[in-house]
Amino acid sequence: ADHGDMLGERGLWYKMSFHEWSARVPFIVSAPQRFQSGRVGTPVSLVDLLPTLLDLSGDPHLEAPADRLDGQSLVPLLQGEVASLDRPVISEYLGEGAVAPMVMVRWGRYKYIACPADPPLLFDLQEDPDELANLAGRPEMQDIEVQLDQVVRKHQDLNQLHEAVVASQQRRRLVFAAHMTGTHTPWDFQPVFDATNRYMRNHLDLNDVEGRARIEST
């Protein structure tokens, strides 16, 4: 899964936030012939899946990919060569319940949440696993907060992204209104079936019918 669920914690349901109940899910790998069993506490991401699979397969494209890979191979973690990865892990949310783009950065024990519509949140998950104490704005946490905020700014300009989303919504609303004017023509894909050639008929050979059911015509 790519997310968990809020089950009443903080009065919230579903996902729609970056609190641990929603954002944290286990990344499970089962390869008993290759790796010893164990648990690793370092944050990872779904974008690590592709480089990990490339690494496991021995694919040479991992060394010189055609395009930049966002993630990092987790094979060193799986093989016990390292205990953690010292790098930020980034998550984005622009879906239901968000009035502006939200970005979460996990780096070691710290979690930082940024959103143009809300004050920043900073949690020390080692000391505060329930995320009850927001450390953002505290003088003693200034260096950590600045470091994580720079990760967000380097990743994405949230104000610019918000403007782009609103502009896209306005264009799509205009197109939708135009399509709904006069005779409505749906864009939904509608496959057309010819029943005379779809099922077994006297004029059709069994092998031809079964072949068409399995192989796309060209």
Language-model segment annotations:
Residues 1-11, 57-60:
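Metal-dependent active-site segment of extracytoplasmic phospho-/sulfohydrolases and closely related
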Residues 5-9, 15-16, 99-101, 113, ...:
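Short catalytic/ligand-binding loop motif for oxyanion handling, primarily in non-cytosolic enzymes
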Residues 13-83:
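Substrate-binding rim/cap in mid-to-C-terminal beta-strand-loop elements of soluble/periplasmic
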Residues 31, 105-108, 115, 125:
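Active-site beta-strand termini and strand-to-loop segments that position acidic
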Residues 50-54, 75, 79, 123, ...:
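Non-transmembrane alpha-helical segments in soluble domains
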Residues 87-91, 166:
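WW-domain-binding short linear motifs
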Residues 128:
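Intrinsically disordered, low-complexity polar regions and short flexible loop motifs
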Residues 137-218:
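Long, internal low-complexity/basic segments
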